[in-house]
Amino acid sequence: MKSKKQTKLLLILDGWGYSKTTKNNAIALANTSVWDRLNQTFPHSLIHTSGKDVGLPGKQMGNSEVGHLNLGAGRIVKQDFTRIYNELQNGDFFRNPILRNSLEYANDNNKAIHIMGLLSDGGVHSHEEQIHAMLEMTSRQGCKNVYLHIFTDGRDCAQKSAKKYIKKLESKMKELNTGEIVSLIGRYFSMDRDNRWSRIRYAYELIAKGKAKFLAKSALNAIELAYARGETDEFIQSTSIKAPTSIKKGDVLILMNYRADRARQITCAFTDEDFQGFSRGTFVPTQFVCLTEYKKDFNLPVAYPSSKLNNVLGKYLSNLGMTQLRIAETEKYAHVTFFLNGGIEQAFNGEERVLIPSPDVATYDLQPEMSAFELTDALVENIESQKYDLIICNFANTDMVGHSGKLDATIKAVEAVDTCLGIIYKAMFAIGGEMLITADHGNAEQMINPQTNEVHTAHTNNPVPLIFVSNRKADIMKPGKGALSDIAPTLLAMMDIEKPDEMTGNSLLTFK
């Protein structure tokens, strides 16, 4: 009979930030009796999740990919956004061999170039400056027939801000005398990550075949028509600009999103010869270029390949022969697996995974509890098994519902998670385990932009809480002294394991 483990649990409450301001703060306004009791009883602090503290430029807000990379790496991880930003500053971007080769191919073979991606300054999945730079590269290389397929945001930025970004892009096009915006669609359709292929189909048919629900005279007109229909940027339906434009065999497609999770499905639709998501009709092969590595087995040209991270938490524990469980609902499954493991898709030896399906609803404000209770049931069952040295669990609610901008729904999401915390605490207490609770970034603590008084759907730069739940006595680092890169070393300290040299983060706990 196998011995029972002294299980440690890392709970990641996605989007659960901290703000002193209680107005329009879903976390402060919610009934959180369990959370309040944990804060009053156990060592707690605040840690950083944005900007240079997580490998991003300046005051750039954090996000789930960045957060989980830092959580698992135990060091500040230089992000793709930062790598590309730096190369834009020093000019290396325009010398990128993969991008240059794709443009040369188009010129040599008289093929069109299609640039697609999320157009905003949100900086979570993409940045408008990088799309502008790609357009400039086509101009420098004398490319003809350059088409732009725009994904509108409204999630990592204001809900109705698309016009601002379109105007800047059109100004750049005029300056360079190149490029034409031929289609426009909201990210809700083009950037699904939850296998809702019916959404991706709208984006694919728009870009590949020029098949759209609506036709507009210009990109700005497309946005005006969408607003008149009651849509915000995230949900703008497929629209062709001036006349339908389709992709021809051998055309170059460049996807300018750098974050993998919401780029994978649209990439599959354009590149997988055995694609099963929906009927594409006759498959049109293209020269598809990924800005970053969305998935290793795609075997596609990648402008910015991933940098390998050695001795991330999962691999380090695996090498020590320890057991671990990763558990989340669909929306955050990639984060507790692929991203937490430093961009490695395959599970490490001794690592098991449990996926709880996210509810099939149009938007999560319609079901704020999402699958939190099913997730909790599965988590408690695995806690009680005492099979694992470490369990890492993500609750998606406060981020995914927070993105809706609906305060009442987000309060319900917070309260659902709080109820689950009570159940999990009892299970961990019963086995004598220890629990570290934190978040990857803020969101739900700011539902209105205080400067504009508009609905706020994006992440924040606020710190996030950290609570150490244990019968052991410990001092915790003062608020503002730690960051997400310190969490893996802290977990190792809880397990009485020395951290590897690669982990430059520090334990935030001092045991008495």
Swiss-Prot record:
Keywords, alphabetical: Glycolysis, Isomerase, Manganese, Metal-binding
Cofactor(s) needed: Mn(2+)
Entry keyword annotation includes Manganese: yes
GO biological process, one term: glucose catabolic process
Active site, per annotation: 64
GO (cellular component) term, any one: cytosol
A Gene Ontology molecular function term of the record: phosphoglycerate mutase activity
UniProt-listed InterPro entries: Alkaline_phosphatase_core_sf, BPG-indep_PGM_N, Metalloenzyme, PGAM_B_sf, Pgm_bpd_ind
Residues the entry annotates as binding substrate: 125, 155-156, 187, 193, 259-262, 332
Pathway where it operates: Carbohydrate degradation; glycolysis; pyruvate from D-glyceraldehyde 3-phosphate: step 3/5
Enzyme Commission code: 5.4.2.12
Catalytic activity, reaction form: (2R)-2-phosphoglycerate = (2R)-3-phosphoglycerate
Pfam families for the chain: iPGM_N, Metalloenzyme
Free-text remark on how the cofactor is bound: Binds 2 manganese ions per subunit.
Function statement: Catalyzes the interconversion of 2-phosphoglycerate and 3-phosphoglycerate.
Homology family: Belongs to the BPG-independent phosphoglycerate mutase family.
Family annotation (PANTHER family): 2,3-BISPHOSPHOGLYCERATE-INDEPENDENT PHOSPHOGLYCERATE MUTASE
Subunit structure: Monomer.
Listed name of the protein: 2,3-bisphosphoglycerate-independent phosphoglycerate mutase
Originating organism: Vesicomyosocius okutanii subsp. Calyptogena okutanii (strain HA)
